[in-house]
């Protein structure tokens, strides 16, 4: 038996991908699932190829002494309370974003994790993709020089044809275009540009197509970020486009630029200004959770737990920072004004 025994909370689309990724790794195995829907333990065990106990009561599952960690894949409105319950029970936590739907929920979740001393992995999994490991390598090697501008944009038409649409579109669970989905683009921009955000401005709009009329919040937002060190960034979160899924990346530095899978650098001999070099990686080009780099992320998480360390890249501190910028951006378009990050940090 693998070392860490994991219980999954919620049994939907994301949960299936979490179970497969955890079980495919070398350090953990899913042994329990808690769901509001009745589940047959024998059928679930056969489907996932390992013994799984089922629960309808989260407290009962968390009380089990042979449970080391939980993976929260429930509706967004439940994340904060379930995360706090798991932390207080002494369980390490994997949680789908968001940590909370607003600043108050974020602070409650953050404080509970810190007070309990458990380790946490937040599913900003794009940081662990081969694409952004390659991009970060180009940045860290200095091939772009000093970055001064970046844009990372999320284009994914989420309409009635999409499985999660009935609850994604609600203000209760979806909350905003940026928090629901564009958060991955914001998280990657912050990873690539580094430094502290000083101020954000954000604008909202939405499609006239009737397919997207069900959204209870603007389905497109564009956010401009001003960093304390002078860098500028932009994130578009577009849920009402009619096109293939597209995760756009453009970074500009003093010695070169990177555009999706291409980059140019003045520091590479033999290149002229009209030539791109090409990066080799598996791109983020699908919304299917089965294609997300969960296995890499979860392996890194359980490695960190073994060492008694905080997870790198997608631990608590990084996730809180991304949420803070998102909440500033959402406040900016709602109040039609620039928002200083200091307003969020001192709230």
Where are these predicted regions, by residue range?
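Hydrophobic residues in well-ordered beta-strands that form the structural core
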Residues: 95-96, 120-122, 235, 260
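Active-site loop of classical SDR/Rossmann-like NAD(P)-dependent oxidoreductases
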Residues: 36, 242, 286-299, 314
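Contiguous beta-strand/loop segments that form the cofactor/metal-binding neighborhood of enzyme cores
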Residues: 186-266, 295-310, 346-347
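C-terminal helix-rich "cap/oligomerization" subdomain common to oxidoreductases
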Residues: 28, 69-72, 228, 300-347
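Rossmann-fold dehydrogenase core element
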Residues: 108-125, 145-150
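Predominantly a Rossmann-like dinucleotide-binding segment in NAD(P)-dependent oxidoreductases
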Residues: 126-214, 336
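N-terminal Rossmann-like dinucleotide-binding module
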Residues: 1-49
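Beta-loop-alpha module in the N-terminal Rossmann-like domain of NAD(P)-dependent dehydrogenases
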Residues: 52-112
């Amino acid at each position: 038996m693998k070392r860490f025994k994991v219980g999954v909370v919620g049994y939907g689309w994301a949960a299936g991908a979490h179970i497969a990724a955890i079980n495919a790794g070398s350090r953990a195995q899913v042994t329990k699932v808690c769901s509001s829907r009745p589940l047959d333990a024998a059928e679930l065990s056969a489907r996932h190829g390992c013994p799984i106990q089922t629960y309808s009561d989260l407290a009962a599952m968390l009380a089990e002494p042979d449970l080391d960690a939980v993976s929260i894949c429930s509706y967004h409105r439940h994340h904060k309370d379930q995360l706090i319950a798991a932390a207080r029970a002494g369980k390490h936590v994997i949680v789908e974003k968001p940590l909370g739907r607003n600043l108050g929920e974020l602070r409650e979740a953050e404080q509970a994790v810190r007070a309990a001393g458990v380790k946490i992995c937040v599913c900003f999994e794009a940081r662990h993709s081969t694409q952004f490991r390659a991009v970060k390598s180009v940045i860290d090697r200095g091939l772009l020089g000093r970055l001064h501008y970046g844009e990372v944009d999320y284009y994914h038409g989420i309409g009635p044809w999409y499985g999660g649409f009935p609850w994604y579109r609600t203000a209760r669970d979806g909350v905003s275009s940026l928090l629901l989905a564009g958060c991955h683009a914001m998280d990657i921009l912050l990873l690539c540009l580094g430094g502290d955000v000083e101020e954000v401005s954000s604008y909202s709009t939405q499609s006239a197509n009737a397919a997207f009329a069900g959204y209870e919040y603007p389905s497109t937002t564009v956010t401009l970020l001003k960093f304390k060190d002078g860098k500028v960034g932009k994130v578009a979160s577009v849920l009402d486009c009619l096109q293939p899924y597209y995760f756009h990346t453009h970074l500009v530095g003093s010695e070169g630029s990177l555009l999706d899978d291409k980059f140019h650098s003045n520091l590479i001999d033999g290149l002229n200004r009209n030539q791109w070099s090409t990066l080799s990686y598996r791109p983020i080009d699908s919304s299917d959770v089965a294609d997300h780099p969960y296995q890499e992320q979860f392996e890194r998480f359980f490695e960190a737990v073994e060492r008694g360390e905080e997870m790198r890249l997608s631990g608590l501190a990084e996730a809180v920072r991304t949420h803070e910028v998102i909440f500033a951006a959402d406040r900016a378009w709602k109040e039609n004004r620039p928002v200083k990050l200091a307003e969020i940090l001192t709230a």
